[in-house]
Protein backbone atom coordinates (compact mmCIF):
# COMPACT_ATOMS: atom_id res chain seq x y z
CA UNK A 1 0.00 0.00 0.00
CA UNK A 2 1.21 3.54 -0.71
CA UNK A 3 2.47 5.76 2.08
CA UNK A 4 0.72 9.07 2.68
CA UNK A 5 2.68 12.31 2.98
CA UNK A 6 0.54 14.94 4.66
CA UNK A 7 0.95 18.63 3.79
CA UNK A 8 -2.10 19.92 5.61
CA UNK A 9 -1.69 23.64 4.97
CA UNK A 10 -4.02 25.36 2.52
CA UNK A 11 -2.74 27.33 -0.50
CA UNK A 12 0.49 25.45 -1.12
CA UNK A 13 1.74 27.20 -4.23
CA UNK A 14 3.73 25.99 -7.21
CA UNK A 15 6.88 27.76 -6.00
CA UNK A 16 6.77 25.56 -2.89
CA UNK A 17 6.16 22.44 -4.96
CA UNK A 18 9.17 23.22 -7.17
CA UNK A 19 11.12 26.43 -6.43
CA UNK A 20 11.62 28.78 -9.37
CA UNK A 21 15.42 28.62 -8.98
CA UNK A 22 15.30 25.02 -10.21
CA UNK A 23 13.31 25.69 -13.38
CA UNK A 24 16.41 25.35 -15.53
CA UNK A 25 15.42 21.92 -16.82
CA UNK A 26 12.38 20.00 -18.02
CA UNK A 27 13.84 16.63 -17.04
CA UNK A 28 11.57 15.04 -14.43
CA UNK A 29 14.34 13.11 -12.70
CA UNK A 30 16.23 16.36 -12.15
CA UNK A 31 13.17 18.32 -11.00
CA UNK A 32 12.29 15.47 -8.65
CA UNK A 33 15.41 16.16 -6.58
CA UNK A 34 13.89 19.46 -5.45
CA UNK A 35 10.21 18.52 -5.08
CA UNK A 36 8.64 20.25 -2.05
CA UNK A 37 12.11 21.50 -1.09
CA UNK A 38 10.95 24.78 0.45
CA UNK A 39 8.17 23.05 2.38
CA UNK A 40 9.92 19.88 3.51
CA UNK A 41 13.58 19.33 2.61
CA UNK A 42 13.43 15.67 3.66
CA UNK A 43 10.48 14.80 1.44
CA UNK A 44 12.53 13.54 -1.52
CA UNK A 45 14.47 11.20 0.76
CA UNK A 46 11.30 9.69 2.22
CA UNK A 47 9.04 9.40 -0.80
CA UNK A 48 8.79 6.07 -2.60
CA UNK A 49 7.27 5.22 -6.00
CA UNK A 50 3.49 5.08 -5.74
CA UNK A 51 3.22 7.24 -2.62
CA UNK A 52 0.40 9.75 -2.18
CA UNK A 53 0.38 13.39 -1.10
CA UNK A 54 -2.55 14.58 1.01
CA UNK A 55 -2.81 18.36 1.05
CA UNK A 56 -4.95 21.30 2.09
CA UNK A 57 -7.28 23.29 -0.14
CA UNK A 58 -6.21 25.24 -3.24
CA UNK A 59 -3.17 23.06 -3.82
CA UNK A 60 -1.01 24.29 -6.71
CA UNK A 61 -2.01 27.94 -6.60
CA UNK A 62 0.32 30.70 -7.77
CA UNK A 63 2.15 30.86 -11.07
CA UNK A 64 1.32 28.35 -13.77
CA UNK A 65 4.10 25.86 -14.32
CA UNK A 66 3.86 22.28 -15.50
CA UNK A 67 7.14 21.68 -13.69
CA UNK A 68 5.09 21.47 -10.47
CA UNK A 69 3.41 18.36 -11.84
CA UNK A 70 6.58 16.95 -13.39
CA UNK A 71 8.56 17.29 -10.15
CA UNK A 72 6.06 15.29 -8.11
CA UNK A 73 5.58 12.66 -10.80
CA UNK A 74 9.33 12.36 -11.20
CA UNK A 75 9.68 11.85 -7.45
CA UNK A 76 7.34 8.86 -7.69
CA UNK A 77 4.15 10.43 -6.35
CA UNK A 78 1.15 8.65 -7.86
CA UNK A 79 -1.54 11.12 -6.78
CA UNK A 80 -2.26 14.30 -4.85
CA UNK A 81 -5.50 14.36 -2.87
CA UNK A 82 -6.87 17.66 -1.61
CA UNK A 83 -10.26 19.30 -0.95
CA UNK A 84 -9.74 21.26 -4.18
CA UNK A 85 -7.01 22.47 -6.51
CA UNK A 86 -5.99 25.65 -8.24
CA UNK A 87 -7.67 25.48 -11.64
CA UNK A 88 -4.50 25.66 -13.75
CA UNK A 89 -2.68 23.08 -11.63
CA UNK A 90 -5.65 20.72 -11.95
CA UNK A 91 -5.67 21.16 -15.73
CA UNK A 92 -1.91 20.62 -15.94
CA UNK A 93 -2.30 17.44 -13.89
CA UNK A 94 -4.86 16.00 -16.30
CA UNK A 95 -2.82 17.01 -19.35
CA UNK A 96 0.20 15.22 -17.92
CA UNK A 97 -1.65 12.08 -16.85
CA UNK A 98 -1.19 12.84 -13.15
CA UNK A 99 -3.94 12.13 -10.62
CA UNK A 100 -5.34 15.12 -8.72
CA UNK A 101 -8.27 13.89 -6.61
CA UNK A 102 -10.72 16.17 -4.81
CA UNK A 103 -11.82 14.92 -1.39
CA UNK A 104 -13.27 16.97 1.45
CA UNK A 105 -11.85 16.23 4.90
CA UNK A 106 -8.89 14.32 3.52
CA UNK A 107 -6.29 15.96 5.78
CA UNK A 108 -8.18 14.66 8.82
CA UNK A 109 -8.17 11.07 7.60
CA UNK A 110 -4.43 10.46 7.79
CA UNK A 111 -1.38 11.20 9.83
CA UNK A 112 1.90 11.62 8.02
CA UNK A 113 3.49 8.27 7.18
CA UNK A 114 0.35 6.14 7.38
CA UNK A 115 -0.67 3.82 4.56
CA UNK A 116 -3.72 4.21 2.33
CA UNK A 117 -6.05 2.01 0.33
CA UNK A 118 -7.04 3.91 -2.82
CA UNK A 119 -9.88 2.63 -5.01
CA UNK A 120 -10.06 4.73 -8.17
CA UNK A 121 -12.98 2.85 -9.67
CA UNK A 122 -14.96 2.88 -6.45
CA UNK A 123 -14.00 6.48 -5.70
CA UNK A 124 -12.87 5.83 -2.13
CA UNK A 125 -9.76 6.17 0.00
CA UNK A 126 -9.42 4.30 3.28
CA UNK A 127 -7.12 4.42 6.27
CA UNK A 128 -6.56 0.74 7.13
CA UNK A 129 -5.29 1.61 10.61
CA UNK A 130 -8.45 3.41 11.69
CA UNK A 131 -10.89 1.81 9.27
CA UNK A 132 -12.19 5.23 8.28
CA UNK A 133 -13.02 5.90 4.66
CA UNK A 134 -13.88 8.90 2.50
CA UNK A 135 -15.29 9.26 -0.99
CA UNK A 136 -13.66 11.55 -3.51
CA UNK A 137 -15.02 13.23 -6.61
CA UNK A 138 -15.11 10.50 -9.29
CA UNK A 139 -12.34 10.73 -11.84
CA UNK A 140 -13.79 11.21 -15.35
CA UNK A 141 -13.06 8.26 -17.63
CA UNK A 142 -11.39 10.66 -20.02
CA UNK A 143 -8.91 11.70 -17.30
CA UNK A 144 -8.22 8.05 -16.45
CA UNK A 145 -7.57 7.30 -20.11
CA UNK A 146 -5.13 10.20 -20.33
CA UNK A 147 -3.44 9.05 -17.13
CA UNK A 148 -3.15 5.49 -18.43
CA UNK A 149 -1.61 6.78 -21.66
CA UNK A 150 0.91 8.87 -19.72
CA UNK A 151 -0.34 12.32 -20.66
CA UNK A 152 -2.35 14.25 -23.22
CA UNK A 153 0.20 14.02 -26.05
CA UNK A 154 0.59 10.28 -25.57
CA UNK A 155 -3.20 9.91 -25.43
CA UNK A 156 -3.63 11.80 -28.69
CA UNK A 157 -0.85 9.83 -30.38
CA UNK A 158 -2.41 6.55 -29.29
CA UNK A 159 -5.73 7.70 -30.74
CA UNK A 160 -4.07 8.60 -34.03
CA UNK A 161 -2.35 5.20 -34.16
CA UNK A 162 -5.66 3.40 -33.58
CA UNK A 163 -7.41 5.53 -36.20
CA UNK A 164 -4.58 4.95 -38.66
CA UNK A 165 -4.80 1.20 -38.11
CA UNK A 166 -8.57 1.32 -38.58
CA UNK A 167 -8.18 3.18 -41.87
CA UNK A 168 -5.48 0.78 -43.05
CA UNK A 169 -7.76 -2.17 -42.30
CA UNK A 170 -10.67 -0.49 -44.05
CA UNK A 171 -8.50 0.26 -47.08
CA UNK A 172 -7.27 -3.35 -47.23
CA UNK A 173 -10.82 -4.70 -47.00
CA UNK A 174 -12.00 -2.32 -49.71
CA UNK A 175 -9.19 -3.44 -51.97
CA UNK A 176 -10.36 -7.06 -51.81
CA UNK A 177 -14.09 -6.47 -52.32
CA UNK A 178 -16.56 -9.16 -51.20
CA UNK A 179 -15.32 -12.70 -50.70
CA UNK A 180 -15.68 -14.73 -53.91
CA UNK A 181 -15.99 -11.62 -56.10
CA UNK A 182 -12.56 -10.65 -57.49
CA UNK A 183 -12.35 -6.90 -57.72
CA UNK A 184 -12.19 -5.68 -61.29
CA UNK A 185 -14.02 -8.52 -63.04
CA UNK A 186 -16.96 -6.19 -63.61
CA UNK A 187 -16.25 -2.50 -62.86
CA UNK A 188 -19.97 -1.76 -62.77
CA UNK A 189 -20.43 -4.21 -59.89
CA UNK A 190 -17.41 -3.31 -57.78
CA UNK A 191 -18.37 -2.90 -54.13
CA UNK A 192 -15.20 -1.22 -52.87
CA UNK A 193 -14.49 2.46 -53.41
CA UNK A 194 -12.27 3.44 -56.31
CA UNK A 195 -8.63 3.92 -55.27
CA UNK A 196 -8.83 7.67 -55.64
CA UNK A 197 -11.93 7.77 -53.41
CA UNK A 198 -10.32 5.67 -50.69
CA UNK A 199 -7.16 7.76 -50.82
CA UNK A 200 -9.08 11.01 -50.60
CA UNK A 201 -11.06 9.80 -47.59
CA UNK A 202 -7.93 8.68 -45.78
CA UNK A 203 -6.21 12.02 -46.29
CA UNK A 204 -9.31 13.81 -45.05
CA UNK A 205 -9.36 11.68 -41.89
CA UNK A 206 -5.71 12.49 -41.17
CA UNK A 207 -6.38 16.20 -41.56
CA UNK A 208 -9.33 16.14 -39.11
Curated annotation (Swiss-Prot):
UniProtKB keywords: Amino-acid biosynthesis, Branched-chain amino acid biosynthesis, Leucine biosynthesis, Lyase
SUPFAM superfamilies given in the database record: LeuD/IlvD-like
Domain of life of the organism encoding this protein: Bacteria
Subunit structure: Heterodimer of LeuC and LeuD.
PANTHER family named in the record: 3-ISOPROPYLMALATE DEHYDRATASE SMALL SUBUNIT 1 (PTHR43345:SF2), 3-ISOPROPYLMALATE DEHYDRATASE SMALL SUBUNIT 2-RELATED-RELATED (PTHR43345)
Protein name as it appears in the record: 3-isopropylmalate dehydratase small subunit 2
CDD domains: IPMI_Swivel (cd01577)
Record-listed E.C. numbers: 4.2.1.33
Biological function: Catalyzes the isomerization between 2-isopropylmalate and 3-isopropylmalate, via the formation of 2-isopropylmaleate.
Record pathway: Amino-acid biosynthesis; L-leucine biosynthesis; L-leucine from 3-methyl-2-oxobutanoate: step 2/4
Taxonomic lineage: Bacteria, Thermotogati, Deinococcota, Deinococci, Deinococcales
Gene expressing this chain: leuD2
GO process terms (BP): L-leucine biosynthetic process
Region (Disordered), start-end ranges: 163-208
Pfam families in UniProt: Aconitase_C
Molecular-function GO terms, alphabetical: 3-isopropylmalate dehydratase activity
Similarity field: Belongs to the LeuD family. LeuD type 2 subfamily.
Catalytic activity from the UniProt record: (2R,3S)-3-isopropylmalate = (2S)-2-isopropylmalate
Amino acid sequence: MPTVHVFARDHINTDEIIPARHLTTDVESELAKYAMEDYDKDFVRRVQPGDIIVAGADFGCGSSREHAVWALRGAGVSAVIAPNFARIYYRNSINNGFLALECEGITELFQDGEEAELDLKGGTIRNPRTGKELSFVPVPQFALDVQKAGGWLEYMKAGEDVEGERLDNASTSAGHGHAGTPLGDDPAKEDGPRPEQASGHQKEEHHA
